[in-house]
């Protein structure tokens, strides 16, 4: 996910995307805790995607 793509979305779309990413992060954390997660790098990728969405939301709030 690229920040430029996120900047083209509306605030409502970004909030929906953030909610989906947070749910995905929760599910991945549960899989990691139970030892079912094979691709541990996905946790890092989702965490960074969440940060990107939050950054763009902050930019839009300030503008």
Curated annotation (Swiss-Prot):
Pfam families referenced in this protein's UniProt entry, alphabetically: Ribosomal_L29
GO terms of biological process kind: translation
Domain of life: Bacteria
Keyword check for Nucleotidyltransferase: no
UniProt keyword list: Ribonucleoprotein, Ribosomal protein
Xref: SUPFAM superfamilies: Ribosomal protein L29 (L29p)
One Gene Ontology molecular-function label: structural constituent of ribosome
Classification via PANTHER family: 60S RIBOSOMAL PROTEIN L35/50S RIBOSOMAL PROTEIN L29 (PTHR10916), LARGE RIBOSOMAL SUBUNIT PROTEIN UL29C (PTHR10916:SF0)
UniProt similarity note: Belongs to the universal ribosomal protein uL29 family.
Protein name: Large ribosomal subunit protein uL29
Organism this protein belongs to: Vibrio campbellii (strain ATCC BAA-1116)
Gene designation per UniProt: rpmC
């Amino acid at each position: 996910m690229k920040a430029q793509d996120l900047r083209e979305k509306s605030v409502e779309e970004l909030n929906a995307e953030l909610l989906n990413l947070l749910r995905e992060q929760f599910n991945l954390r549960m899989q990691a805790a139970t030892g079912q997660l094979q691709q541990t790098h996905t946790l890092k990728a989702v965490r960074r995607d969440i940060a990107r969405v939050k950054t763009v939301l902050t930019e839009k709030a300030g503008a």
